[in-house]
Amino acid sequence: MKKQLLIVSVVPLLTGCGIYTNYQKAEEVPMNLYGEEVLIDTTTVGLGDLGWRSLFTDPQLQALIERGLQNNTDLQSARLRVEQAEAAMLSAKLANLPSFALAPQGTISSFDKHEAVETYSLPLTASWQLDFFGGIRNAKKQAKALLEQSRDYEQAVQTQLIAGIANTYYTLQMLDAQLSICEQTEHSWGESVKSTRALMNAGMANEAAVSQMEAAHLAVKASVLDLKEQINQVENSLSLLLAETPQHIQRTSWTEVTFECPESLSIGLPIQLLANRPDVRAAERNWEAAFYSTNMARSAFYPSVSLSGSAGWTNSAGGVIINPGKFLASAVGSLTQPLFAQGRLVGQLKIAKAQQEQALLAFQQALLNAGTEVNEAMVACETSRAKSDLLDRQVASLEKAYHSTSLLMLHGTTTYLEVLTAQQSLLSAQLQQTANRFKEIQCIINLYSALGGSNY
């Protein structure tokens, strides 16, 4: 009865010292994590719950993502980190088991040319560290947290890779569209130069008008070259994501883009970021690992208890040789209590506590960063969507203005400056219209990534 009472009283004591306490997962986040201006819709499936194949339906893009998931070196490195963490976890699990070793030994000796004496021993040794004070337990829980962190990191890299490939792919499509606009404009402005020169020959325009038109035409030709260079650079960037050499990227045209922005965006509750966003999960796992590291530092103040023993056959009994050999067994129990370690244990505990606080701050910052990214992506989506109709109407109005001023110039009722202004305004609006369409797509991709992005 006294022994049972002793055990019952020791367990709460050790728990109170912190070496047997368990990590409590974070379960609350600020409800306004996404910002006060972002309305939360919980009636539909969140964008972050969609699989990437459901969001990106372009076959060319899907093929590129598959290649990236297979070849990308950063993702492969993340997978190797998981393998390392799995090995560490296996080692931590087996630390509770006793260790065994076989150490056979034989000698042949002769003194003053007497008959040689042979001795042998075949011992099997065993040792077992008893985990009375939680050191092994906390190490195992820390290894498990680090394993989960490595898996979360792998998923975070995969989500970023998918978003990066998609963003780069649609960037190429946007640049293709802008290149087409500039090439058409180059042809149109070339015709305007010819028309202005004809008017000058007829005495209806001057040399300044021709020079201005030619300068504008040459500027567009330079823009065409710049866009071709940008396309090459973006193709190379995408090739790097695929871990492949520079190459032309097969893609659909901008007019065939199948990406549709949802009419209403559902982003879910802020608490879902703890479950959906892998980098936030990884930061929390790091905090959990630091928690158990602190427990391990506390347990180092307590005694270590171990059992060891050996058993085997030997023909050496001190100075006597016995043939045949006899069975020999021994067992030893030991307890080691740290008394004075030059402040090492106290220092390790302080370091562990500080690292735990750092991990908590990093987790809190990761959560704030995630909320900010969701907020910015949502506002960008709303802004680009609101601008879309305005830009469409602007382009339509400028097309009318350009055609009208061109006709008026041919009839001598307006100047070349008005035509030039209309041309430049139309080109700028068309490029802006294309860029805004790309921004609509990009902000959905960024929002998908900010919400965690399902990787199935």
Predicted regions and their residues:
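Short, conserved phosphate-binding/catalytic loop or strand-edge motifs used
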Residues: 120, 192, 211
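Repeat-solenoid scaffold signature
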Residues: 202-230
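Terminal intrinsically disordered/low-complexity segments used for targeting and assembly
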Residues: 1-70, 228-275, 449-456
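Amphipathic alpha-helical coiled-coil/rod segments that serve as protein-protein coupling scaffolds
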Residues: 87, 95-96, 114, 195-201, ...
